[in-house]
């Protein structure tokens, strides 16, 4: 393993979980960048020639925009979907009510409806501003069945596109890097960082309007360390009030913890799991109800008598003081841990010198992937043993949660389970999440 002094720390991959790579065909058009290894290879982290023609003059990005993630569907709302949604009643007090039915976590048609109603509306975290802090940098990712590409052009403007070539639908770029343009690996079509079609190979004898073949754009905004995208074409770009548009009235509370210039990205860990994305969210929001039973080491770090959960519009904030008796004398959490879950699938955590973000990406009715990004205060960046142990502890917690979530998913698939009950008030965060889901899906 390389020493910390010689190791280059960078974003090793993106939410899509694709390894950093580029097609060799791109070499003739693009600036190259060396993608470094991750912080610790011992930690179980999932990393993720055409003849060209003349430049097509005055090409601009295409104005053709799909209306939603499920752009092939006029609507995903069917009588069956309505029935499934209304099997949960948010008006019934949680103490007396039942949890959503198992079909919320297993039905393929409801999953398609979620992509349309939840993930194609409003802002979603796509990546981090450090990934595109320099001109010509880019990163890629996925959200449901949408592949996206975010870049900063040579003039410093940030763009976001569907990461799909407009010729024959090939995925255009992979991973992260730095390029002066994007070259399709299939037929060598070349697109500028503004999405315009610059070159189309072997088209000398054809006439077509390049304006209709630029990359399909997405709304994009930067809020502090976060790069946000939206598939919803209604409204403004939201670059000034995007925090309030995304989170609501508690944007300042999240900003207070996440906007810290002393923090530096240090590592990414990925955890694919065979469960519905909402199973993980439910698990995250149970106010540590499961922690004493499933996470022995983590439980020893916490003072459960101080645990507090606040419901704030689209955010559920959990706070807990750390235990005075640190396991083996190792202090990872500092005096208090702060966990902010942002509807529908993102969390910001602050504890000790750390910030971690959690992104749970839906991949299907019974499949999702958790991406955990670690940020550390600059003063601790040279303490390699502390860094490795802290990441190992937190990664082990996520691995334990993967086992739990996959077990729950198997149980949801059985005929024995229909709905459950809430244990209040400890599961009020879960109920709040379910009420938001019902409102959005309805």
From Swiss-Prot:
Binding of [2Fe-2S] cluster, residues: 165, 167, 184, 187
Transit peptide stretch: 1-58
Pfam families recorded: Rieske, Ring_hydroxyl_A
SUPFAM superfamilies: Bet v1-like, ISP domain
Textual note on the cofactor: Binds 1 [2Fe-2S] cluster.
The protein's annotated pathway: Amine and polyamine biosynthesis; betaine biosynthesis via choline pathway; betaine aldehyde from choline (monooxygenase route): step 1/1
Factors inducing expression: By salt, drought and heat stress.
One Gene Ontology molecular-function label: iron ion binding
Names of the cofactor(s): [2Fe-2S] cluster; Fe cation; Mg(2+)
Oxidoreductase as UniProt keyword: yes
Compartments it resides in: Plastid, Chloroplast stroma
Example of a GO biological process term: glycine betaine biosynthetic process from choline
Domain of life: Eukaryota
Alphabetical keyword list: 2Fe-2S, Chloroplast, Iron, Iron-sulfur, Magnesium, Metal-binding, Monooxygenase, Oxidoreductase, Plastid, Stress response, Transit peptide
Recorded GO CC terms: chloroplast stroma
InterPro entries hit by this protein: Rieske_2Fe-2S, Rieske_2Fe-2S_sf, Ring_hydroxy_dOase_asu_C_dom, Rng_hydr_dOase-A
Record-listed E.C. numbers: 1.14.15.7
First-level EC class: oxidoreductase
Catalytic activity: choline + 2 reduced [2Fe-2S]-[ferredoxin] + O2 + 2 H(+) = betaine aldehyde hydrate + 2 oxidized [2Fe-2S]-[ferredoxin] + H2O
Positions of Fe cation binding: 290, 295
Domain Rieske positions: 123-229
Family: Belongs to the choline monooxygenase family.
Reported function: Catalyzes the first step of the osmoprotectant glycine betaine synthesis.
Protein name per Swiss-Prot or TrEMBL: Choline monooxygenase, chloroplastic
Species whose genome carries this gene: Amaranthus tricolor (Joseph's coat)
